[in-house]
């Protein structure tokens, strides 16, 4: 997936911008307050339907204008598709391929941008949930099976946890183990493959920039030498005691 064309109107300080982009690398250079960050923000908005800087649409609309528009052309193994976003003080309108779309997920399925900003250090400083979100967004970008697998896993996890919290017979929770284990193993495999793709590049960056050996390792959330179904069964009594599932990809 590559953004190869971009049009921005009345977004932040940008009055009207039209760019043809390289599918792989683009470098934006300019003076302070010239609009570089606003341009990146517009690209992010095109793929996420939101900003990484603010939740208030009126702050993104250029002063004196009623709305902003962002249109981009995305290519991926074919002629490509046009994505569009219109933001007003009343809300956001999304179009995919010229047709109205229901949610920002329709944008992300074609163009899921990832941003590395000054807060990237929080990936190391904060808990594992932030790292899981960062990792999962990357997997979603390259693995088409990821989203349905992720949804299937979390649907089963919610049902199992609900059964555990209500304190009924163990069979009410165990009935979800097969679905949870199947989706969990598949989800972990997708994550693991993505980490394997990233690891060589990260190691090279560590050597060249820091002079250090850097390794990227994925800990999947249960014993490495054990199937998830076995771990779920072994931990059932603890799960019933605390009303939650303690092993699985959600604990990675």
Describe these PLM feature segments:
Residues 122-123, 129-174, 178:
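Long, charged N-terminal accessory/stalk domains
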Residues 1-31, 45, 52, 57, ...:
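Conserved NTPase motor "head" modules and their coupling/switch loops across ABC/AAA+ ATPases, GTPases
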Residues 44-130, 135-146, 196-204, 229-240:
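Nucleotide-state sensing region of NTPase/ATPase domains
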Residues 36:
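Conserved lysine of the Walker
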Residues 31-33, 148:
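Juxtamembrane helix-loop transition sites at the ends of transmembrane segments
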């Amino acid at each position: 997936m590559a953004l190869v064309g971009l049009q921005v109107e009345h977004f932040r300080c940008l009055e009207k911008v039209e760019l043809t982009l390289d599918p792989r690398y683009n470098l934006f250079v300019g003076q302070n307050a010239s609009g570089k960050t606003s341009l990146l923000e517009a690209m992010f908005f095109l793929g996420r339907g939101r900003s990484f800087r603010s939740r208030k649409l009126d702050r993104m609309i250029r002063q004196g204008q009623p709305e902003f528009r962002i249109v981009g052309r995305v290519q991926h193994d074919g002629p490509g598709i046009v994505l569009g976003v219109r933001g007003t003080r009343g809300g956001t309108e999304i179009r995919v391929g010229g047709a109205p779309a229901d949610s920002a997920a329709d944008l992300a399925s074609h163009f899921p941008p990832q941003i590395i900003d000054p807060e990237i250090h929080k990936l190391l400083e904060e808990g594992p949930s932030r790292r899981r979100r960062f990792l999962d967004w990357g997997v979603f970008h390259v693995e088409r099976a990821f989203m349905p697998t992720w949804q299937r896993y979390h649907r089963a996890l919610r049902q199992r946890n609900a059964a555990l919290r209500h304190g009924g017979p163990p069979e009410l929770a165990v009935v979800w183990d097969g679905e949870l284990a199947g989706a969990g193993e598949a989800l972990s495999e997708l994550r693991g493959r993505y980490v394997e793709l990233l690891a060589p590049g990260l190691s090279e960056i560590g050597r060249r920039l820091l002079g250090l050996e850097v390794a990227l390792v994925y800990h999947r959330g249960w014993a490495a030498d054990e199937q998830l179904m076995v771990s779920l069964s072994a931990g059932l009594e603890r799960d019933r005691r605390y009303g939650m599932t303690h092993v699985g990809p959600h604990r990675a």
